[in-house]
């Protein structure tokens, strides 16, 4: 029950400016078996925004230019990551903790940007990063998905029909409320 509360809170965090109420510097990572709903939850988060405000980080993103153009997004979602995912570890760590980043741009100068986007990850595998002295695990809230759901070919259509109800309904309010309660509980202190 406590893990569900924290998970809802970190989903709710995606609907606010990343450092508006807390400076935790933590990514939400859904990890586990296939067909457990990891990507569906990230899709739910993405559907809450205008499509222009969502950055999609593909599994085969370029290591040097993977974040080019994403700094204007409100949320960045990386679904179905595999061992081919090659965003540098240092950059992934900086996304979590630094408000300003220097982003490589193809055929242009690096750009120092105010990086405000929240980040959500879903994968079936442990990513290939090294956890030197806890440098990665303290920047991730890992939610382990263990129980597969029956596959539905119309799941996206069903979810799209219900998303309007969810926006007005309990899930959106619950996630935002859980996040605000977390902020009041932890405050600006480091979460770990």
Question: For each predicted feature, which ranges?
Answer:
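Short glycine-/polar-rich loops that comprise or flank the Walker A/P-loop
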Residues: 52-53, 72-74, 99, 115-118, ...
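AAA+/SF3 P-loop NTPase mechanochemical coupling elements
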Residues: 64-72, 103-122
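Conserved catalytic/switch belt of AAA+ P-loop NTPases
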Residues: 50, 89-111
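Phosphate-sensing "switch" segment of ASCE/P-loop ATPases
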Residues: 113-116, 132-192
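Switch/connector loops and helix/strand junctions flanking conserved nucleotide-binding motifs
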Residues: 37-39, 84-87, 127-132, 149-154
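A short beta-strand-to-loop transition that corresponds to the Sensor-1 phosphate-sensing loop
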Residues: 80-82, 105-107, 116-126, 145-148
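P-loop NTPase catalytic core of nucleic-acid-dependent motor ATPases
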Residues: 1-72, 141-144, 184-191
């Amino acid at each position: 029950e406590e893990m569900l509360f924290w998970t809802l809170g970190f989903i709710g965090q995606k609907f606010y400016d990343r450092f508006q109420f807390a400076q935790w510097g933590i990514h939400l990572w859904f990890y586990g078996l296939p067909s457990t709903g990891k990507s569906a939850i990230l899709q739910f988060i993405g559907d809450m925004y205008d499509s222009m405000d969502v950055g999609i980080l593909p599994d085969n993103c370029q290591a040097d230019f993977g974040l080019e153009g994403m700094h204007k997004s409100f949320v960045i979602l990386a679904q179905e990551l595999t061992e081919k995912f090659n965003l540098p570890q240092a950059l992934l760590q900086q996304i979590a903790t630094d408000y300003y980043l220097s982003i490589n741009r193809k055929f242009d100068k690096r750009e120092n940007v105010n990086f405000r986007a929240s980040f959500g990850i879903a994968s079936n595998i442990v990513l290939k990063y090294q956890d030197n002295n806890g440098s990665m695990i303290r920047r991730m809230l890992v939610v382990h998905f263990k129980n597969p759901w029956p596959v539905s070919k119309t799941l996206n259509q069903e979810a799209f029909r219900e998303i309007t109800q969810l926006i007005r309904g309990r899930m959106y309010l619950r996630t935002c409320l859980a996040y605000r309660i977390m902020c009041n509980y932890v405050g600006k202190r480091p979460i770990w």
